[in-house]
Amino acid sequence: MLKAKIIAPDFLKGEIEKSLINDFSLYNREGLTIFPSFCDVHVHLREPGFSYKETIKSGTMAGARGGFTSVLSMPNLNPVPDTVENLNVQLGIIKETAKINVYPYASITVGQKGEKLTDIKSLSKLAVAFSDDGRGVQDDKMMEDAMLLAKENGKMIVAHCEVNALLNGGYIHDGEYAKKNGHRGICSESEYAQVARDLELVKKTGVSYHVCHVSTKESVALIRQAKKDGVDVTCETGPHYLILSDKDLQENGRFKMNPPLRSEEDKNALIEGIVDGTIEMIATDHAPHSAEEKSKGLEKSAFGVVGLETSLSACYTHLVKTGIITLEKLIELMAINPRIRFNLPFENAFTAFDLNESYKVNPKDFISMGKATPFEGMEFYGTCYLTALNGKAVYEK
């Protein structure tokens, strides 16, 4: 008999209930809410090349603790997965050490340098999609050619949209806080100008296209209009962009990520985008760094914060408990839409949370090697008790 509450679309409910009752009866109890496991399309696992920041093992264990059983790993690695040989290095480590499913991106350009396209055809057999995340592809013709090749090979282009010429050495949003505290700002146009360019190229090429970490109101408006025009575009935003703005900034590296926390107006536009379906998924852009790299204040710290272990509870507390969206909608954003869009299987997997149990975010508790989060010290509702994959616990509290 079912005692826990299952929140899942009908096509997944039966499988989840069966696995819960047969394999994990201990978690079939009142007070627990069971979800299909989550899928994060934007994660930096740092291995190979930067395993002092995170490893595939530590990153996937952190994912499991957050309720995830699928993550898509970004290509800013060493070696960059820009050839089949290099991608196989990462796939080998995934096979040996990953605790959950990891689907790697291949890079759009060789070495992510933006100078020459990778062999998209040969990489298409192994890569989930193509991205140069961490930087935008600056050359219009190169991006157009990449889109044509991706379309030819049935793959998606996943874009970090940023015009380098507009960055001017900025490192936080070009808003009130930057002006008041003498910081160099990153203007919103550096993002939305490239979103606009890419959407024109998508119309021209017909490629499937996805925008990473949308942070500005203008980007949301452009994507909303493109969808109305029938363009094959989806996008994601991160929990921190939906919950915080530049008015929450402190002089601390844990508030530094790219794109930066924008204005309150931008934050509200992102929430509106989530509500009306313009933004179909929430992705963490989990980007771990060493303590030293994050200890140098806003100006000098590395860009990037972690997010896998707080994503559900952060969004549940600030979007669901506040009545902005339903719990069902949050599960669509975190578990259903990402898999559908990226054509990934719905695993035999689920996660169990106590949504009434609150906790104070303490990075010391994180499994991830990265400890920098703008949510440190905040109180969130929703504690993960179990994440199950193929009848086995990949995380238990």
Where is each model-derived feature located?
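N-terminal metal-binding scaffold of metallo-dependent hydrolase/deaminase domains
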Residues: 1-27
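Metal-associated gating/positioning segment near the N- to mid-region
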Residues: 29-94
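Active-site mouth loops of central-metabolism enzymes
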Residues: 41-54, 77, 103-116, 182-189
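A glycine-rich helix N-cap at a beta->alpha junction
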Residues: 91-108
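Histidine/acidic residue-rich metal-binding segments in metalloenzymes
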Residues: 117-282
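His/Asp/Glu-enriched, well-ordered alpha-helical/loop segment
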Residues: 180-206, 273-276, 280-282, 287-353
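C-terminal cap of metal-dependent C-N hydrolases
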Residues: 297-300, 321, 348-397
